[in-house]
């Protein structure tokens, strides 16, 4: 089961959140009238199906819904559940009702980072370290505007769950491949690896999300970080994340805000970005405001401010030693949502996916949620969780220690087992992905036997596809 490049590149747009066959089976219609005003103007180009490899699909995501107010019955159910919880309690072990779930796994949600991945195509060609940091900051901000309004939480991945996908970028005729795996369930830990060596970068991430109940809101705090590596320049950009806060879960309008601090830092260039995602004040103010500064050592060279779902402007600091710029305004556009082109995600069709791949694993839950059949959604979700508990019990009884399939721990850091940080050679074979392993087309890969996977994962043979 491979995901790789095709010989011709197509101009693709918009990463999906719900597989097209799930959408089609449920006649799920996402009208453009449901788009927010800023999303209406974001362009994407149609997918040329002739560029897809056998068994692949590329689909656009549903339009983000408008803000919502829960109906009386589900709200009463949520109030009943939350009334028994203490403020500050960790929600990772609390079975949340399915009507607040987004029909995709957290592993798939990580692909939001590449909705506008074409921004990075020429990153390694920029000569100025400051210009490179500006472009990385622009890309970072581009990931937030596509989000579910209201209360929409992705599925907690089960242990051993994987997600794999790719994107094709027309500008550089490059192929970007991503694999992700849930390497721990309690506490939840997700690992991701992304490779686009032709454009000169890879990215590794270890994410430890935790949720807290805060009364009329709940917060999803994202511990961990991602590291974007520029291969030819040997620069590493360490990225941290803000907090998502869902408000109005008991009374009021349901909405999600991005709040708190995040950073992008490069030790090799001594440049750091400090960002502050602002919560809307109780009276006045606006949603989705971000401000920040870019520092070279201890000197602030630039500041930026705006709305990450619309436009963010960057200004050369008056105190900066490089402010001998041209006379007049020093304001530039750092990020403009209206001018952004989305990039379409390509995955295997669900029928071609492995049993523990996110879209196939959760497909029955997703079907039910899309149809707003909470009874079936709850049944299917509980079934998956019961099966996971049984596997944990079986491993414990048989003294089997579970091992991640695609990632390994080295010096207290999780790294992708098959990472390749060598410089791209234009004469090298195409880089493709097979069963989670990124490799050159035409080269043999060592595949573990079904029995070894059964022993490691604690699953039945019928659940393993090799």
Swiss-Prot record:
In this chain, composition skew of type Polar residues spans 1-12, 46-60
Task: Give the transmembrane ranges.
Answer: none
The superkingdom listed in its UniProt entry is: Eukaryota
An annotated GO cellular component: cytosol
Region Disordered: which residues? Answer: 1-67
Query: What Gene3D superfamilies does this protein's entry cite?
Result: 1.10.287.2720, 2.40.160.120, 3.30.70.3490
Checking PROSITE patterns in the record gives: OSBP
Q: List the disulfide bonds.
A: none
Q: Name one GO molecular function term.
A: sterol binding
Per its UniProt record, what SUPFAM superfamilies does this chain match? Oxysterol-binding protein-like
Compositionally skewed regions (Low complexity) per UniProt: 24-45
Q: Which family does it belong to?
A: Belongs to the OSBP family.
Put simply, this protein is called Oxysterol-binding protein 4
Task: List the taxonomic lineage.
Answer: Eukaryota, Amoebozoa, Evosea, Eumycetozoa, Dictyostelia
Gene transcribed to yield this protein: osbD
């Amino acid at each position: 089961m491979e995901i790789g490049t095709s010989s011709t590149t197509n101009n693709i747009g918009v990463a999906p959140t719900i597989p097209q066959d799930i959408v089609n089976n449920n006649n799920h219609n996402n009208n453009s009238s449901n788009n927010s005003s800023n999303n209406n103007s974001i362009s994407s180009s149609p997918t040329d199906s002739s560029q897809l490899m056998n068994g692949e699909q590329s689909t656009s995501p549903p339009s983000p819904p408008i803000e919502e107010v829960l109906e009386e019955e589900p709200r009463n159910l949520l109030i009943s559940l939350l009334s028994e919880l203490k403020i500050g309690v960790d929600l990772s072990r609390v079975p949340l009702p399915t009507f607040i779930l987004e029909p995709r796994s957290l592993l798939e949600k990580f692909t939001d980072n590449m909705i506008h991945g074409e921004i990075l195509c020429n990153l390694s060609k920029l000569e100025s370290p400051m210009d490179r940091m500006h472009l990385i900051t622009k890309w970072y901000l581009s990931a937030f505007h596509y989000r579910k309004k209201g209360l929409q939480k992705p599925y907690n991945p089960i242990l051993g769950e994987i997600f794999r996908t790719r994107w094709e970028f027309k500008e550089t005729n490059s192929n970007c491949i991503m694999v992700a795996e849930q390497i721990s369930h309690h506490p939840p830990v997700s690992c991701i690896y992304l490779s686009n060596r032709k454009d000169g970068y890879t990215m590794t991430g270890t994410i430890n999300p935790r949720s807290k109940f805060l009364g009329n809101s709940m917060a999803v705090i994202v511990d961990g970080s991602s590291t974007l590596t520029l291969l030819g320049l040997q620069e590493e950009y360490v990225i941290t994340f803000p907090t998502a806060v869902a408000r109005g879960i008991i009374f009021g309008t349901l909405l999600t805000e991005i709040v708190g601090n995040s950073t992008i830092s490069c030790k090799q260039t001594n440049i750091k970005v400090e960002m502050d995602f602002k919560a809307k004040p109780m009276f006045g103010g606006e949603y989705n405001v971000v401000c920040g500064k870019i520092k070279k050592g201890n000197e602030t060279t630039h500041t930026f401010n705006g709305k990450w779902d619309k436009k963010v402007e960057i200004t050369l600091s008056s105190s900066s030693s490089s402010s001998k710029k041209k006379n007049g305004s020093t304001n530039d556009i750092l990020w403009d949502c209206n001018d952004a082109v989305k990039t379409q995600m390509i995955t295997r069709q669900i029928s071609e996916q492995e049993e523990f791949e996110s879209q196939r694993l959760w497909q029955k839950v997703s079907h039910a949620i899309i149809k707003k059949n909470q009874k079936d959604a709850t049944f299917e979700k509980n079934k998956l969780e019961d099966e996971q508990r049984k596997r944990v019990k079986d491993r414990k009884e048989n003294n089997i220690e579970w091992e991640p399939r695609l990632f390994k721990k080295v010096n207290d850091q999780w790294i992708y087992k098959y990472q390749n940080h060598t410089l791209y050679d234009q004469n090298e074979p195409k880089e493709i992905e097979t069963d989670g392993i990124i490799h050159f087309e035409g080269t043999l890969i060592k595949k573990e036997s079904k029995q070894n996977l059964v022993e490691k994962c604690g699953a039945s043979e019928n659940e393993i596809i090799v």
